[in-house]
Amino acid sequence: MFSMCKQTHSATAVEFSIACRFFNNLDENLVVAGANVLKVYRIAPNVEASQRQKLNPSEMRLAPKMRLECLATYTLYGNVMSLQCVSLAGAMRDALLISFKDAKLSVLQHDPDTFALKTLSLHYFEEDDIRGGWTGRYFVPTVRVDPDSRCAVMLVYGKRLVVLPFRKDNSLDEIELADVKPIKKAPTAMVSRTPIMASYLIALRDLDEKIDNVLDIQFLHGYYEPTLLILYEPVRTCPGRIKVRSDTCVLVAISLNIQQRVHPIIWTVNSLPFDCLQVYPIQKPIGGCLVMTVNAVIYLNQSVPPYGVSLNSSADNSTAFPLKPQDGVRISLDCANFAFIDVDKLVISLRTGDLYVLTLCVDSMRTVRNFHFHKAAASVLTSCICVLHSEYIFLGSRLGNSLLLHFTEEDQSTVITLDEVEQQSEQQQRNLQDEDQNLEEIFDVDQLEMAPTQAKSRRIEDEELEVYGSGAKASVLQLRKFIFEVCDSLMNVAPINYMCAGERVEFEEDGVTLRPHAESLQDLKIELVAATGHSKNGALSVFVNCINPQIITSFELDGCLDVWTVFDDATKKSSRNDQHDFMLLSQRNSTLVLQTGQEINEIENTGFTVNQPTIFVGNLGQQRFIVQVTTRHVRLLQGTRLIQNVPIDVGSPVVQVSIADPYVCLRVLNGQVITLALRETRGTPRLAINKHTISSSPAVVAISAYKDLSGLFTVKGDDINLTGSSNSAFGHSFGGYMKAEPNMKVEDEEDLLYGDAGSAFKMNSMADLAKQSKQKNSDWWRRLLVQAKPSYWLVVARQSGTLEIYSMPDMKLVYLVNDVGNGSMVLTDAMEFVPISLTTQENSKAGIVQACMPQHANSPLPLELSVIGLGLNGERPLLLVRTRVELLIYQVFRYPKGHLKIRFRKMDQLNLLDQQPTHIDLDENDEQEEIESYQMQPKYVQKLRPFANVGGLSGVMVCGVNPCFVFLTFRGELRIHRLLGNGDVRSFAAFNNVNIPNGFLYFDTTYELKISVLPSYLSYDSVWPVRKVPLRCTPRQLVYHRENRVYCLITQTEEPMTKYYRFNGEDKELSEESRGERFIYPIGSQFEMVLISPETWEIVPDASITFEPWEHVTAFKIVKLSYEGTRSGLKEYLCIGTNFNYSEDITSRGNIHIYDIIEVVPEPGKPMTKFKIKEIFKKEQKGPVSAISDVLGFLVTGLGQKIYIWQLRDGDLIGVAFIDTNIYVHQIITVKSLIFIADVYKSISLLRFQEEYRTLSLASRDFNPLEVYGIEFMVDNSNLGFLVTDAERNIIVYMYQPEARESLGGQKLLRKADYHLGQVVNTMFRVQCHQKGLHQRQPFLYENKHFVVYGTLDGALGYCLPLPEKVYRRFLMLQNVLLSYQEHLCGLNPKEYRTLKSSKKQGINPSRCIIDGDLIWSYRLMANSERNEVAKKIGTRTEEILGDLLEIERLASVF
């Protein structure tokens, strides 16, 4: 069985985050990684353009509200295991160090020339002698970097340290000279100067023979040589054995002398508590480190005695280490994350989501004398924490949305003496209890998503520093207050615990929900619903991968080819200046003018011309005027009054118009470009033709005028910092923090520098030190607020395939790209090194343009261009180039060399292979063409339609056969969403009206004008449009009940419990434990089943089932069982299997519950109460009910290792057959009479049920051990495969082939294909392949095939699809060529990544046979010439491959 695996929704979980200067040394960026995705964000002001004009950045004291903006995304062929950054000697930016399993390390850096990641060095330590006999893949390769950037270390296989030394920056002069002079030395001389020196290995046993089971490694601050702390446990223990062996952890500090390669141990601490988790170094001037254990915090320093506190009463019994109980605190640091926000303060995020601020109270000797804990907020469950710009904190999460918080420290400067401390702290404790109640409500993450502003300026922390001194002395304390405020959140749909497909709810024209009964399964519109998140971050996520617009109304207009909407004179309107007033429809020979208000009416006798076809209509002069362009005229109107009519008489019709207010650019059929500008002299507006023109040969085939607000399009070099904004204002004052403090006199300043008088400015506390460093960093957001002056540019494409950029109005050529239709990854200026004098008018025609003919003969010609500023306030310009085969989407990035300081980097490429060819046939009769050319022709209708506000979003609509929306929001990520169905959109316009707010209108193939809105409940700034319904508890299993069209969901809530059952034989008694105030009680789970209606996505009231305490739901399915009394029909029932988890001493027992959902008359005013749940059967079983399914109308249950078949009769279950299997069956699926079961440890088995004999028998099984997570059938016409996902993140396909010799006569299932996915899959379902689309390929190759959709615990979605053999062979050859053809990011080989991974040595080779869809799809993004070369190598045509890809894309876009 040949198949392909492709990921369609990338992972959204965040596991690692660091702050680093990724693009340049001025700006700090946030780099996050999760699974195999790496993203780079910047913190940017969230200020609209209208507000920004009123702000003066230099006068603002406080930073505005901030947002996270994604600047780069990289998908890797390997999961990130550890992420760090380092500043290398003489580098313009930081380098990233990323480790991968089992022992790979890549050093990477941003490449400013191509806006890509370049690999600086690769380090590989997976040889067998380094492995030391280990076959398991248990060890995480942890990377740590010395704070002074002298070296980095990586722990491999838990037994060895890799040391990566960095060269010191000795001579700055040499580096500066090297930038200027060409290097003529031999390559060997170059190698010796690289910033990264040769790496080497240290075996930990050589340092100390006891070092084993390493828990954490960290570098200490402030040592002359790099000093590494290693926390390890030489002899392991566990909580059940601490009476025998406790305090097993040891901390050693090793000094790394890199030159001599000697590594003495300089400091050892023995007998640390057995539950040590991590160690955190503390910066100078305090120094030392904090050791975090599950129940305690310990401060260690080489020169002072240790100081530790216990955080709960468990620490008192589990360790002999001297710990002082911490008053008022009862927490556990298990699964907690930590980050220093100051030298003496760190934020702790607990596994419950609570945020605490821990202050180290330091005495005058810089020794930690006390800890002060303070509960600051309740937030998301974090996986990592990172501090940015010293006042922002990023909480990365795998289980909920990641958050960006802003924290500010207010200084009340209240001076109090030690006597007041006691009363103060008591009073504060009372205040805090009240405050905590409010905080729990404010800071819970899902409410933040809905109303982040509520959380503004809440008082979070009001804390005093406790100072221990002699009682007589009055020590001075300062009260400090922290304010936390949520700025932004990143959507995350991980982990996908369970998912299913359900029917989509349709909306009728009047907004009523409509549930059409599909004629056939092929017409069924389905959506993907997933149970995502955990605990209070739990949610139901509804995914759609095609937008289904809500059609408000539609009417038929025969012969209309194009549509526009425009505004009336903005000065006449008082408030509603953003609503469209006129709609113009162009027909082949005429134009319709409609006025749009409460109603849409045709108007006549206006200044608009109606007896000619309109080419374009738009607004000019800040929406005060309207310009209408026909094939022969340009008309300027104010409202409906004609002001000016400019005839265009150049012997050829106008075919394309582009506007950048106040410029109007026209393209004439014969290749000329005419530009007009709006001038208002003495109050009379008129359009003036620009006397500057551009050459008309080779003929211009596409134009786009662009008004730049981003400041990227500039030819000046002096106003360029290396930042993303142009700023002459702040370029000079970037060293602003060197200015005198306002409260210092000048003479004091000199004393401070040179004399003793400086002692007047001694620091009060550690915090004052940090305050000064904070002030110096406050320039960064001011730079981002400076507004760039608008500039105007004309982008044209010529018949020769070149793309040219001209500055307006002087029409000077500033940028020239050869062969733009080739679609190179980076577009560069061919004139970068041409003297500017050549770009004058005379020389440009002959000299440059002739020399720039396309290099590649087969490059498709550009047919249409669009340059549009997307993102917030148009700060992210995109270039869209449409050719016959595809749409190329480029982003603009700053490039300081060259004339115009930009380059273009390809972001994505859309396959438009189905579009009808639009080139002109040359064999037509010339006279006929002359008459027709002045009429409106469909081939000239623009396919790229920019819009400013559709549902609050701006972007581009790509019309045609595969219509789709292209969005790039303020979050900075490109989103492409297709329209559902196989409709062809002819033309499109945004439409804002009283009745249709922020909607749009479009023509489909039937000449129907559809007025629609985007459904507002979906979030479009996501890989797939998604709706997240918060549940505030963990969602477990989820099923769709098709008869009643309702979702059934199992939820789990957790709360501490003080009671438990004591068992005496069969009797059980409930006993209550009381362990004191500081004891942390265990967590108990309460399960419940609820119904959720897909019309409102609310829980149906009074239709839930609450299970008993201690009863866990282990299996849940909708089963089709035979009706009572009638043998023919089957009815859907809800079947739930449970298990009572009491303790390890009691045999597990469970219940089988069977329920029916019945419809009743809803209560008045409560339409949701139409469902009730009726219990059919409930009975205790002799074991845990671990899996459920149905076969031929019978019920199949797995009770641990036994499989039972039951018949439902008279409200009771009657046993029919049973069989014993391996260890513990946790999943059962059936098809016809075959039962496919998954064992938790012993792989899979195939059973057969024979109804006439009432027997259940084992047909075949896999003999190798395998920890199975999920199973599903692979249906390929008449072939049946068994798809399995396992604990090692692989996908394996088995088949039953009794004729094959190696199957031992059918006893053994054969492994036919395997593939390493790299993410854990727990849930899958099947969908039948349907042929959708206008131009259907014959024959349809995917008849009777099913594809399997999977969801991962990292928030990714994908599918496995059986391929026809012909397509598989073509893809396999393509895959083999691409493996060596493309450069490997981070040095990771896709083939190695996709090879089956196993920790046990098995005597079988990898089967492969599954195509890597992600690698195949990368073929689309290659340049046209490269694609042709690759296709030639495998003996096929590019169109064949692109056709296959398009067909598979169509099959998969059913949601």
From Swiss-Prot:
Q: Name one GO biological process term.
A: mRNA 3'-end processing
Q: Which GO terms describe its molecular function?
A: mRNA 3'-UTR AU-rich region binding; myosin binding
The transmembrane residues are none
- Pfam families, sorted: Beta-prop_RSE1_1st, Beta-prop_RSE1_2nd, CPSF_A
Keyword match S-adenosyl-L-methionine:
no
Per the record, its GO cellular-component terms are:
mRNA cleavage and polyadenylation specificity factor complex; nucleus
* Alphabetical keyword list: mRNA processing, Nucleus, RNA-binding
List the InterPro entries hit by this protein, alphabetically. Beta-prop_RSE1/DDB1/CPSF1_1st, Cleavage/polyA-sp_fac_asu_C, RSE1/DDB1/CFT1/CPSF1, WD40/YVTN_repeat-like_dom_sf
* Annotated localization: Nucleus
Where does this chain mainly localize?
A: nucleus
Q: What does this protein do?
A: Component of the cleavage and polyadenylation specificity factor (CPSF) complex that plays a key role in pre-mRNA 3'-end formation, recognizing the AAUAAA signal sequence and interacting with poly(A) polymerase and other factors to bring about cleavage and poly(A) addition. This subunit is involved in the RNA recognition step of the polyadenylation reaction.
Could you give the subunit structure recorded for this chain?
A: Component of the cleavage and polyadenylation specificity factor (CPSF) complex, composed of at least Clp, Cpsf73, Cpsf100 and Cpsf160.
PANTHER family linked to this entry: DNA REPAIR/RNA PROCESSING CPSF FAMILY (PTHR10644)
Q: Which family does it belong to?
A: Belongs to the CPSF1 family.
Can you name this protein?
Cleavage and polyadenylation specificity factor subunit 1
Source organism: Drosophila melanogaster
